[in-house]
Amino acid sequence: KRVVGIGSPRASLEPNFLLKHWLGPTNFSSGLSDPEASAIEKLTKILSSTTANVPSVRQMESADAILILGEDVSNTAPRIALALRQAVRNESFSMAEAAGIPKWQDAAVRNLGQDELSPLVVVTSSESRLDDVASHIYCLNPDEIADFGFSLAEKLNGGEIEDEMVCTAADILLQANRPLVVSGISGSHPDILSSAAMVADTLSMSNKDTMLSLCVPESNSMGAALLRDQNTLSLTEVIEQLDKIDTLVILENDLSRRLGKNALQKLADSKVDIISLDVLENDTLNLSSMVLPAASFAESEGTLINFEGRAQRYFPVFEPANERLPSWQWLVKLASLGSDEKLSGLDCFDDVVSLLASSDEKWSEIDKVAPGQAFRDRGQKIPRQTHRYSGRTAMNASVSVHEPP
């Protein structure tokens, strides 16, 4: 019988990889919708080839001129939006430094700066929550946003462009010491990414401190895209092959957000058994024959590929409640029910990471992202709580109370 797995950009690398390793590439889908997968693939190629710097969130705060091209950053990347709010204050910090006021003297810095902000040019198709700190706001449709970006790149390269908006943005970026270009895939227009990359690359020819940041929609969108190859299935192909599939294993993915109404109805009408692993209630669980409760990010360990293309590890701070288990453990248990031994011998998280590192050259350094379970700090494990944790004995008083006689 054929079992097909659908991964998720919400889940970490490890369970996505285990699902692919267990069922094989020809029976695995990354869980990205077709337009989303195409856009993120293009985004990863841009990040790997751009001559501009790809900044961290902290580095974005140092920008002294910012261009947002076709991305509602407050919705897709709120932490980056906060960094941009910090960045526009750099003008007041420069004024304070010239006046001899230390940066930590916040009240004095704000009083001196008043409404003086570093330039922020927002070019989007709707209002955004950054409009209140923007110096220039241009509301255009997606086609016009892409054309704006290409015209701006041409102007930065010395071309003759008469458009006043383009000339204004070009002057702002050329006068900056650390310009930042921000874009992403939420505009659902393939040329917006290309135009943003062209602006950053053109600007970097004259300014090596130029930065380019491209936002992705979910925590591990980049990781899910990197697990795709020429043998893996798209979501469309999975739906087309439903009559040849006996069981679907869906990993932390709400397909109602990624499939059209007709495709979702076809899945509901099929005789496929669906096993879902998830921590959140969603419409996909209503279609499932079995639901396995997965641990949340705060109760499990995993690796994400962030918007920079950098691997980041997260660690559990709580024990999974009730019957919940990390997704990778559920997959190991499911695999052990059959005769397939591909996931046998995976006793701890480090074993999964080691298997991932040995599977492909691009993952060869993944086991160096963070220390393994054998790591000790002066002979002790890293505690989840401080030694003097207030209310420790009262946390579970509703379940059990231990008092001296």
Predicted regions and their residues:
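Non-catalytic alpha/beta scaffold blocks inside enzyme catalytic domains
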Residues: L32-I366
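A glycine- and small-aliphatic-rich helix-loop capping segment at beta-alpha/alpha-beta transitions
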Residues: W22-P25, R85
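Long, structured ligand/cofactor-binding scaffold of large enzymes
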Residues: G24-S33
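A residue-level signal for conserved active-site and pocket-lining positions in enzyme catalytic cores
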Residues: G5, L19-W22, V199, L334
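Short glycine-rich phosphate-binding loop at a beta-alpha junction
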Residues: R2-S8, P179-V182
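Short Gly/Thr/Asp-enriched flexible loops that form oxyanion-binding sites at enzyme active sites
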Residues: P15-K20, I80-L82
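Long, low-complexity segments enriched in small/aliphatic residues
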Residues: A196-A197, F349-P405
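Cofactor-cradling patches in redox/metallo enzymes
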Residues: I6-N16
